[in-house]
Each structure stands twice: as structure tokens, then as C-alpha cells.
Amino acid sequence: MAVRGEAAQDLAKPGLGGASPARVARGNHRHRGESSPSPRGSGCCWRALALQPLRRSPQLSSALCAGSLSVLLALLVRLVGGEVGGELEKSQEAAAEEEEEEGARGGVFPGPRGGAPGGGAQLSPWLQPAALLFSLLCAFFWMGLCLLRAGVRLPLAVALLAACCAGEALVQLSLGVGDGRLLSLPAAGVLLSCLGGATWLVLRLRLGVLMVAWTSVLRTVALVSLERFKVAWRPYLAYLAAVLGLLLARYAEQILPQCSGPAPPRERFGSQLSARTKEEIPGWKRRRRSSSVVAGEMSGCSGKSHRRTSLPCIPREQLMGHSEWDHKRGPRGSQSGTSITVDIAVMGEAHGLITDLLADPSLPPNVCTSLRAVSNLLSTQLTFQAIHKPRVNPTVTFSENYTCSDSEEGLEKDKQAISKRLRRSLPPGLLRRVSSTWTTTTSATGLPTLEPAPVRRDRSASIKPHEAPSPSAVNPDSWNAPGLTTLTKSRSFTSSYAVSAANHVKAKKQNRPGGLAKISPVPSPSSSPPQGSPASSPVSNSASQQFPESPEVTIKRGPGSHRALTYTQSAPDLSPQIPPPSVICSSCGRPYSQGNPADGPSERSGPAMLKPNRTDDTSQVTSDYETNNNSDSSDILQNEEEAECQREPQRKASACGTYTSQTMIFLDKPILAPEPLVMDNLDSIMDQLNTWNFPIFDLMENIGRKCGRILSQVSYRLFEDMGLFEAFKIPVREFMNYFHALEIGYRDIPYHNRIHATDVLHAVWYLTTQPIPGLPSVIGDHGSASDSDSDSGFTHGHMGYVFSKMYHVPDDKYGCLSGNIPALELMALYVAAAMHDYDHPGRTNAFLVATSAPQAVLYNDRSVLENHHAAAAWNLFMSRPEYNFLVNLDHVEFKHFRFLVIEAILATDLKKHFDFVAKFNAKVNDDVGIDWTNENDRLLVCQMCIKLADINGPAKCKELHLRWTEGIASEFYEQGDEEASLGLPISPFMDRSAPQLANLQESFISHIVGPLCHSYDSAGLMPGKWVDDSDDSGDTDDPEEEEEEAETPHEDEACESSIAPRKKSFKRRRIYCQITQHLLQNHMMWKKVIEEEQCLSGTENQSLDQVPLQHPSEQIQAIKEEEEEKGKPRAEETLAPQPDL
């Protein structure tokens, strides 16, 4: 039975014999019948075993059949030749004699014996051979038509006939047979050769036997019947009739379907006709076909060239749906040839393999991003749904994207699950907050609020919230914002703002539209001190005039004060085309008529100013740094400010010029830095740049409130101190032009103004240039790396290092970040700090999302302000050649620089604060730690640095901290007033009638600043200095630092008691950090204020139920004074245990 099963399987295999499925079925049925016992079972068994070789080999069976048929035909021809040979010779001799006699009588054509007398019977001898040849032609015609319909190719049949002719001639020449014999022996040889060739050429046995047998029979008939021709020519006449018959059959095959309708289904034989006819045949298409079948069909096509596919192609029918595809292809759809389908099982298996790979937490982020993209594509195709893909705009180029898209995508979207080791290394309080349900209300406070939107599985489900109730979940009424919409994690901005990076070196006008929409908040009301603060509140005695600018500074402009302003198209406009917009006034941001220069802008009404945007004005355009309702913006007062700072006459009032109708209108006179470029009366204050508590408000008073030059002046001093002008050959005028235009773009709002940008820039510079105890440096000599070649100016490849001229190292146990971060990355960090809040409207991301601001719609509610800051600042840089201070960077360096700046700006979004902190902690707690040779590690350090600099207010001294606190409180109250006017719920801590300033700052320090400083210091990156126990911190310059040292004697005693057994062999050294000391001091101050407020209100017993605060005795997760044994590396520090938040 096993042998019989193998025989059945062999018969089912496709081969040259091409056994049909019906034949295999009959064979299987016969085998199943033989399995039953019978009286003659032994004989049947032996016969089956004898026929096994024939059944297994289709080639052998076909050859046996062809050979048997050829032998029978040869014997038949030999028998006919032997019996009729003598009589035929006699009849031929008699016929020849009669023909000679008739010829002698004058006859032209011989006639048969017994012919009719007269001339009419002279043509009768040729009727018989003509009729015979016509019969042969018809026979071969029907045979050819049958073969063509069955799928046999025409060249194959013609080649068989050619082989027959060649075999015929070969036999005649080799045997030397004369013309008087019937060629019985050559006939047998020719038949054998023809049958063998046919067996080898023909694809299927049934068709091969039919063709060979039919050809042999017709050849034999022609050999016997054509008596009027020579014996040697008779086979060739038969072959000629065969060729003509096949050609007629091919012609009939072409014209028959057009006349009689669609033919039955058949396989293709290599012509365009077959492909065209096949499209018209109704039938079921196979959905799954192997690649070999597809390749066989494509290789057989000779009329149309197909591309060679290395991967399976998805047919358009599957992508668009059969009905839609039939509609789109129209009348020419039948000419598309054979459609190629995809094996869904293979795609499903590939999708499963990729899913298994994504489960591995050790994969790099860029690899995970690529695998996830492929998985999404496969899962989309596996659903078999109609997909409508929009066409890509051919005018958009994707060749200029930065080169770090993969790593950038991985850095932006932390979708990998946190490993067990990382979860063990993180404190429970941080794990409780690392969740998508936490967000922040502003980049200044970062207070956590509950997100009402559903959790996105693909973005934040990898980190589960802790089981402990969150502070916001304890008392939801305290937040007072049930309907506040918050944001989700954002993608990288750079993919939505594709700009050719090569244009940065072209000193010409760049005619390209910007992709920026406009934020139009209401004008800020006058600053007012917080109401309801107790008498002991640290901000109760502060004046509200500390933050610029007061409403009195705003000057009403006349009709002649309008200036034409650069505007860009905010978003792709789907509305019908309208006439070109009129010139935009920079004072009010609205178009005005050019016909009457004396007419001023339209008057603003109160209700119109409360609208966040205007959707009815489709022709309205904006600048990069100006909005609709920015009457208090700094660029409005540009003329007056320049007149006061530069002591130049005020610009004459003139009507706005006339411009041609173009897509873009550029300023004829851009905002340029006034003379002198560097103010010389600021040296006394600029000498204090190397102190953490830099008197930035005193600097603002010396420069002048209205000038707005504080950012450009400080930027120039810091770049000059670092040697970046020489390292990168930065032109000073272009540098000052851009930074002056950048600071003009900052609005005069209480907190997010140009003073805040300058403070963040100074903090970043301080954190990267000041000595850090125990930090190893990549290079040994810090001075040698900053030397630049006089020819090249800078080592291209951005791996050179620069150091501050104020960097004085007392010994080799100090280091600084600038010694580990290349100069190009360091300069990108400084530029990002100057750009990071450009054109900030004074409103939070949640407010823009809740009011459906154009920027929120443009950036899909994700990092709205951060994306706008980066886009607007870069658009300003690329708008004028006068701003291009990076002209000496090559193409690769510029793209990398732009990538680093954008990444640093997007990192300031506190919606992703906990993700950054968790990732940084995992890197620090790793065995390897921070690898300064790895660009991704350096980028992460720079992102943490700018994040700490952005929220450094609580880490400053008390005086500066209170100034910044008043500014953010005023900005919050302005947003609360606008929310109340718009009928929106007032956001937490923004209700002017119920101030909670102390709670705001205490929660901000506890949840945001404290853990961030702790993580930054645990990596050994916080500036400080070694302090011996015997020094008693007497060398500190700040008297507050001495007071702070005296306030914590118990901590020192605890540390000394814990290390008492080791004092005999080691000398202990402490690390003093001024930043952390200020943070601890301010945190304790706000907790005391909360206690005093509770005592005044008589709610001490209910404080824990109303406000989620810590006990005053608890310490925040910040840095205390650390100690280290002399001679040990900093990695071996023994820190006091800190409580988890």
C-alpha cells in the first residue's frame, strides 16, 4: 500500500508529461478500488508493480506510447509497400507507355486510364492531387486550431514540422534511396525521429501523441495517394500543407473571437491577443499563487515587457477595491495584462516575526521605529480594506531632510517598555508620575494635571501608573479644570517643515512660503499683584512694576506709523482663490487700503480683541513674530525704541508703499542691529556672567526697557567668551542682526519675554562652562582643543572643543561639560536657548488647544508652542540673507546644527518631562553610564541641561526667585481672566480671586524642579566645588551661602557620624552646590508660607485633604551636600537616603 501511495503521489506531480488532475483522480480511484481484496489479487499486484516505472515517469510513458505508435505505422507502411510493390510497378510502366503514345500524338497532359475523350478530360488528372492537398490542408488546419486552443505554442508546432523535414532529407541522403521506391524503411526512420522530437518538445502527453499521430497518418496518406508526384517530394508536400494549415489556424484564432464572442478560458501562449481576451473572460481569479507561477506567466509574455519584481506587488484592485479600480482604468483596463496578487499568508508570517522582534526591549530606538513602520504597513494590507492614499505633491522635495531622522524619531517617541532593571532603579514616586495621564499646564510651572483624553496605547501604555492615588486624584475639586484639554506626546517638528538646507548659504532673497499659522491671544492687561496673599507672603511687598512693560509705555500710532510687514501663508488654503491680500500693517496686523494713505487702520473693538483667532478673514496673513492682537508687542515700538537707544532722529511718517501682487512680500528694510553693535557701558555687569545669580534685571535697567537689546548683547558676550566667532568664522554683523530680530520677536508679556530667554541662555552657558567636581574630560588639556587652524579656522566634522575664558580650574579634579561636548553641539545648545520661547503668546498649550488656535490645529495639539517657537525662529533665520551668521558651515554641518537646535527646543515641553527624566536616570544607572563619544548620549545631556535652565527660577537666590514668581503669576492671572471672559473653566492657580501662589511654587518644586535637579546631580553634572571639613565653607563669596551652611549643621553631623570609623584612613571632602542650596531654601520658604496661610485661615486640620502637600519635615528629592573620600572617584559617593516623592 505504501508503494501504491508513492505512485499516486508521483503521478500528481507536474512534469513534462503534465498529467491532468482528472487522470490522477482516476488513478487514485483505481488504487482505492484495488485496496479491497479480490480473487485475483496476486496477479493484479504483479501487474501494478510492473507498471510502476511507467506511472512514476511521465516522460517514459510518453516515449513508450510514441515509440509503439511509430513502430505500428512503420510496419503498416512496409506491408503496403511489399504487397502492392509489383503491381504498382507494372501499372506504372503501362501508364508510362500510354503517356508516351499520347504524347507522340500531340497531347500535352497525360490522362488516366479510361479517361473521357476530348479536351475536356485533360484537366481531370490534377483534380485528384489538388483535392488531396486541400484535404491535407484542412486536416492540418483543424489540428493546428485544436493545438492552439489547447495551449500549444505556434513556434513549437512549426519546429516539429521542421524537424520532420530535416529527418526526411537526412534519411534520403544517408540511405541513398531512389525515386522508384515507396521509402518504407526511410518512412519508419522519419516517423521514429519525428515522434521522439515531438515527445521531447510537446508539453503534455495527450497533445503530443495527438500531433505526432496525426502528422504521421497524414504523411503516410500523402505518400501513398499522391501518385502524380515523385515519391521523394510527397512528404515535403504534406509538410508544406501542414505549415499552411497552422498559419491559417493562427489567422482564424485571431478573427474568430471578434466575430463569435469570448472564447473559453485557456492558458496564455505568448501573444497580446491572449492577454486582451483574457481580461474579457468572466471567471474567478486565484487569490494565492506562488512566485514560480507568476514568474512563469511573466516569462512567457513576449508582447509586453514587465519589470522584474524582487518583492511581491500589491495589486491596485486590492488597494482601491474592484469597483473603484474598474471605474478608474476605463476602456483600457483590459490591456493591463495579468494582475499580480500577494500571498496573504506570507505577509501574516512576516508581520508576526516583526511583532516578535518588537517585543525585545534591548533593540535600539531607531531599529524599533523602522520595524514598527513596516509592521504598520503590513497590518494595513492584511485588513483588505479599501485605502485611499493621497498623492504626494510633486513640488515638495524630501531630499533635504536632515540625516538623523531615525535616531531623532527614536528620541522623540519613547515607545519601548521600561525594563525591569530600570523600574527598580526609579523611585516609586517617579514611577507613579511617569504616565500619559500626567501633563503640565505651562512650561513655566509644569504642574501635573489629570488628562481627560483617553490614553494612547501606542505611545504611553508601556508605563503603567502606580497604584497609589496621585495628588490630583485625591481632591479633583482643587484643580478646578474638569474640561481642560491637554496634549499628547508630539512627533518631531522637522518633518512638517521641510526646507532646503542648502539655501542657508545663498545670499539672495528666498522666495518660499512659510508653513506657520498665527497665534493671536488677547492683549495682556495691566499687571496686578496677587490678591489675597497674607502679610507674610514673600511677594506681598513686591511692586508690580518690576516686569516690563507697563501700559503707559504703549504709544498710540497715527496713520503714518504703518509699516509693510513680511507675511507668510499660514497653512494650505483649501478655499477658492481670492485676489491678493492688501499690505499688512505691523501695528494692528490687519490689511488696510492703499488707495488713501491718510486712512489709518480700522479701530479695534473690545469684543473683537477677545477672539483667539479670526476665521472669517481668509486673506489675512501674519509675520513670523507678530499676531493679530499684539498691541503690546515689542516690535510695534521699534521706531521709538531705536530712536531712544541709538539717539537717532525718528523715522519720518510715510504712507505704506505699493507692492505688486505676489505670493510673498519681503521687507525692503529688515530689522537690523543698531549701531554700535556692542554696547560699551555694560562691562561692570557683564563681568558677573560667571555667577549663578547673575543680576539680569539690573542689566535690563541699564540697557533700557524699550530697546530690547538684552538678548543680543548677552549672546555676543557669551559667544565671544567661548571663542565661537573664531571657531566657526561667524560674521559679527549678521550674528547681531539675527539676534536683534530674534529679541524683537519676543513679546512684552510678564514672564515669557526676552529677559526669560536671556536668563535661560545664561543658565545653559553657566551649566556647561563652570567647574564640575569629579567630572572626567574627554581631552586632557582643555586649551589645546580650542586652538583653530589659521587656514581652516575649525576642524570640520564638528568634533573640536571650546572653553570659556572665565574657566579657571584650581586642580585636575574638576571638569566641565564644554570639554566633553563638541563645539558645534554646544553652539546649537546656546542658539536653542535663545530661540526656545520665541513669539510666546503668554498662554499655555492647554489654552491653545481648548480654544482651537490655528497653531494647535497646525501641530495636531502636540507640543504646540514648542513647535511654533522652533518653526518661527528658523523661518526668521531663513527669511533674510542679513541674518545668516552660519554662512561658513557646510551643508552637512548646517543640517546637523539645525537638527540639534530643534531637538533641544522640543525638549522644553514639560509634557514629556517625566519621560526625559526616566530615560536619563536609566542612562546614568547603567553600567556604562554616559558615553561621551556617543552622540545620542550627548544630545540627552544637552536636553536635560536646557530643561533645567528653562525652569531655573526656584534654584536662584530669593530675590531673583521672587521676581520670576511674580512674573509667572501675573501671566497666569491674565490667562485666567481671558478664560473667564470666554466662558471657559479657569485653569488651576490662574484664578485671580482665589490665589494659591505658595501652593503653586511648592508643588512645582516638589514635582518638577527637585527630581530634575536630583537626576542631573546624580549624574555628576552639577557645577560646584570641593569643600574640606576644616574649611567651614569660609571661602564662599556669597553671604547667603554661609548662612545656608550654618542652617544645616545637623546634616553635617549626621554625615560625620556615619563615617566616623573611616576617619583614620581617609579624609572626607564635601561637594558644595549653590544651585541645590537655593532650591532647598526656596522650598522651605514656601512651605513656611503655606503653614502661615493655614494658621491664618484656621484650616490646619484639613490641609492634607484640601491640598496634596508634603509634611514640612520632609525633604524634597533634591541634592543635599555630598561628601566623598579623598582619592575616590565621584561614582563611589555615599549619598544620604532621600525620600521618594
Swiss-Prot record:
Modified residues (Phosphothreonine): 1036
Residues annotated as binding Mn(2+): 756, 836-837, 950
Regulation of activity: Inhibited by cGMP.
Pfam families assigned to the protein according to its UniProt record, in alphabetical order: PDEase_I
Active site: 752
Domain (PDEase) ranges: 674-1093
Annotated binding of AMP, by residue: 752, 837, 950, 1001
Segments of skewed composition (Low complexity): 433-445, 533-544
Residue span of region Disordered: 1-42, 90-111, 433-483, 505-654, 1024-1060, 1120-1141
InterPro entries membership: HD/PDEase_dom, PDEase_catalytic_dom, PDEase_catalytic_dom_sf, PDEase_CS
Keyword hit for Transport: no
Signal peptide per UniProt: none
Keyword Transmembrane: yes
PANTHER family given in the database record: CYCLIC NUCLEOTIDE PHOSPHODIESTERASE
Name assigned to this protein: cGMP-inhibited 3',5'-cyclic phosphodiesterase 3A
Originating organism: Mus musculus
Lineage per the UniProt record: Eukaryota, Metazoa, Chordata, Craniata, Vertebrata
Gene: Pde3a
